[in-house]
Design a protein with these regions (language model features):
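AAA+ P-loop NTPase catalytic core and its hallmark functional loops
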Residues: 1-220, 317-319
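Short, hydrophobic/amphipathic alpha-helical patches that form generic packing surfaces
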Residues: 42-51, 246-250, 274-275
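Short alpha-helix boundary/capping elements
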Residues: 52, 218, 252-256, 277-282
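C-terminal engagement/docking regions of AAA+ P-loop ATPases
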Residues: 78, 262-319
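Exposed alpha-helical structural elements
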Residues: 117, 143, 205, 220-224, ...
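Short flexible/disordered coil segments
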Residues: 149-152, 195, 229-238, 296-309
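Charged, solvent-exposed alpha-helical segments that act as regulatory interaction surfaces
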Residues: 153, 201, 257-260, 282, ...
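Conserved AAA+ ATPase small/helical "lid" subdomain
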Residues: 214-271
Length: 319
C-alpha cells in the first residue's frame, strides 16, 4: 500500500492521502484487442516485469507515425496484465496540476481535489498511458521526473502532499513522429527507456485490422484499401490503418445513402480517398517524389541567402 494512503478508498472513487481526500479518475473501459506484431507486445510486457524485490519496472516510450496503433498496443498490454488502464492525453497546454491533482470548487463551496488518470493509476496500482507525450511542455515533464526514476513519487503543490506509486503501477509514453511536437528534455528521455518503435503492419495484419473494425465491409473494398495502404508504406508515406478505416467508413456511408440511385463502389471509394486524404493521394508515386524533394530542399538550406538566391546565382552571398 502506498505511503500515506489510509486503507481502502473511504468511499466509491475517493482515497485519502495524508488527510487530503482525492477524487479518483475512472478507468478506461474500451475494448483493446491487439492484432498482429506480437513481438512488440512482448517487448512492452517485458519492460513492465519485475525480476527481483529490488528491481523496478521500466517506463518505455512507444514511437511511430500517427494512427499506427501505439495507444492500442499499450491498452492490450494492460489487458494482458489484467490491470486497470488510465489514459492521459498530453497537449501543448498541459499544466503540472493537470498531470497530478486539480482543485475544483465543489457544490458546498469548498475546494475538492481531483486526481488525474496518472495519479489514480499510481495510487491504485493501474497502468497509465501518457498519450502523445512529446506534445507536452518541459514544465509539465519536470513534475514527473521523480516518478520516472527510482523514487517513484510526485509532489502535488496544489494539494500539499507527496504521492507514492503503488508497486504494481506501470507507465508508458506514446510519441508521434511528426513535426508538431515539443522536444522532450534529455533528462526525461533518459528515464523513458527503452524505445519501442511500432511500424506499419504487413498486408495480412492490415486486412485483419480493417475486418476487425469494419466486419460489414465488402471484400473488394477491403482489398482496395489494403492495396492502397501497402503501396503507401512502400513509398514511405505516412498513411496509416486509421486512414484506411476512415476511407472505408465514408465510402460505405456514401454507398448506403441513396438506394434508389446507387453509386458504384469504385466511385465511392475514390471520392472517399480524396475527402479523407486529399487529391494528392490519388497518385502516390508523384506524392512521394514531391515530399522527397521538399525534404531535400530543406536539407540544402545553409543560410539566409538561400531564401533569396538560386544556388548557382553569382550574387549569392554564400557562394
Amino acid at each position: 500500500m502506498p505511503s500515506g494512503l489510509s486503507g481502502q478508498p473511504s468511499q466509491a472513487g475517493n482515497v485519502q492521502v495524508d488527510g487530503v481526500t482525492l477524487r479518483l479518475a475512472h478507468a478506461d473501459a474500451t475494448s483493446r484487442d491487439w492484432i498482429g506484431q506480437r513481438e512488440i507486445l512482448s517487448q512492452l510486457l517485458a519492460c513492465w516485469l519485475v525480476v527481483d524485490e529490488k528491481d523496478l519496472p521500466l517506463s518505455p516510450r512507444i514511437t511511430g507515425v500517427p494512427g499506427v496503433g501505439k495507444t492500442t498496443l499499450a491498452m492490450a498490454a494492460a489487458d494482458a496484465r489484467k490491470q486497470d488502464l488510465y489514459i492521459f492525453q498530453c497537449t501543448t497546454d498541459t499544466r503540472p496540476e493537470d498531470l497530478l491533482v486539480t482543485p475544483v470548487l465543489a457544490e458546498s463551496g469548498k475546494i475538492a481535489y481531483h486526481a488525474s488518470p496518472l495519479v489514480t493509476a499510481m495510487l491504485t496500482g493501474g497502468v497509465c498511458v501518457l498519450d502523445e507525450g512529446n506534445r507536452m511542455n518541459e514544465k509539465s515533464w519536470a513534475s514527473l521526473a521523480p516518478l520516472l526514476d527510482q523514487r517513484r513519487v510526485v509532489e502535488s503543490i496544489v494539494a500539499g502532499i507527496q504521492l507514492k506509486a503503488d508497486r504494481e503501477f506501470r507507465c508508458c509514453v506514446t510519441m508521434n513522429e511528426d513535426a508538431s511536437t515539443y522536444e522532450v528534455p534529455d533528462y526525461i528521455m533518459s528515464r523513458l527507456q527503452p524505445t519501442l518503435h511500432l511500424g506499419f503492419p504487413d498486408k495480412n495484419d492490415e486486412m485483419a485490422i480493417l475486418k476487425y473494425h469494419l466486419p460489414f465491409a465488402p471484400g473488394d473494398l477491403l482489398s482496395l484499401t489494403v492495396g492502397f495502404l501497402q503501396e503507401a508504406h512502400g513509398l514511405d508515406l505516412d498513411f496509416s490503418v486509421r486512414d484506411g478505416i476512415h476511407i472505408l467508413q465514408y465510402a460505405l456511408k456514401r454507398l448506403a445513402q441513396d438506394p434508389q440511385h446507387p453509386m458504384s463502389k469504385d466511385t465511392a471509394w475514390q471520392e472517399s480517398l480524396i475527402r479523407v486524404l486529399g487529391e494528392e493521394a490519388q497518385d502516390l508515386s508523384t506524392l512521394s517524389r514531391k515530399r522527397a524533394r521538399a525534404l531535400g530542399d530543406q536539407g540544402s538550406l545553409r543560410g539566409l541567402g538561400d531564401f533569396f538566391f538560386e544556388g548557382n546565382d553569382p550574387l549569392h552571398p554564400d557562394r
